Amino acid sequence: MAISKEEVLDYIGNLSVLELSELVKAFEEKFGVSAAPTVVAGAVAGGAGGGAAAEEKTDFNVVLVDAGANKINVIKAVREITGLGLKEAKDATEQTPSTLKEGVSKEDAENFKKKLEEAGAKVEIK
């Protein structure tokens, strides 16, 4: 029996950030594609559009730039925000920059940034 699109989306929606990253790499290798040109094209279009494109942005990514000196508190905050296991959260804090959340609202992104910065991390919202 075939798997429905909805089942695939549900499965992907339940993956951790690290698992999603591995899935993207597997897609790139299997199908010979790269996610990079999409980002570059978006950046070029954004530059040409001026301020209007920046105002329309509704989805944001939370990127951990540096875990700082207090890594234990940062790992705890990463686990709370992402739902990752201990090992995955530790790996995410050690392999910076690391995208912790993708496609979240500005309000959620700001809340996540605040929690991580209170724990001692350096965070960017993109």
Swiss-Prot record:
Superkingdom classification of source: Bacteria
GO terms for cellular component: cytosolic large ribosomal subunit
Keyword Ribosomal protein set for record: yes
Keyword field: Ribonucleoprotein, Ribosomal protein
BP GO annotations: translation
Database matches in SUPFAM superfamilies: ClpS-like (SSF54736), Ribosomal protein L7/12, oligomerisation (N-terminal) domain (SSF48300)
Gene3D superfamilies on file: 3.30.1390.10, Single helix bin
GO molecular function: mRNA binding; structural constituent of ribosome
PANTHER family in the record: 39S RIBOSOMAL PROTEIN L12, LARGE RIBOSOMAL SUBUNIT PROTEIN BL12M
Quaternary organization: Homodimer. Part of the ribosomal stalk of the 50S ribosomal subunit. Forms a multimeric L10(L12)X complex, where L10 forms an elongated spine to which 2 to 4 L12 dimers bind in a sequential fashion. Binds GTP-bound translation factors.
Functional summary from the UniProt entry: Forms part of the ribosomal stalk which helps the ribosome interact with GTP-bound translation factors. Is thus essential for accurate translation.
Similarity comment text for this entry: Belongs to the bacterial ribosomal protein bL12 family.
This protein's name: Large ribosomal subunit protein bL12
Native species: Helicobacter hepaticus (strain ATCC 51449 / 3B1)
Lineage: Bacteria, Pseudomonadati, Campylobacterota, Epsilonproteobacteria, Campylobacterales
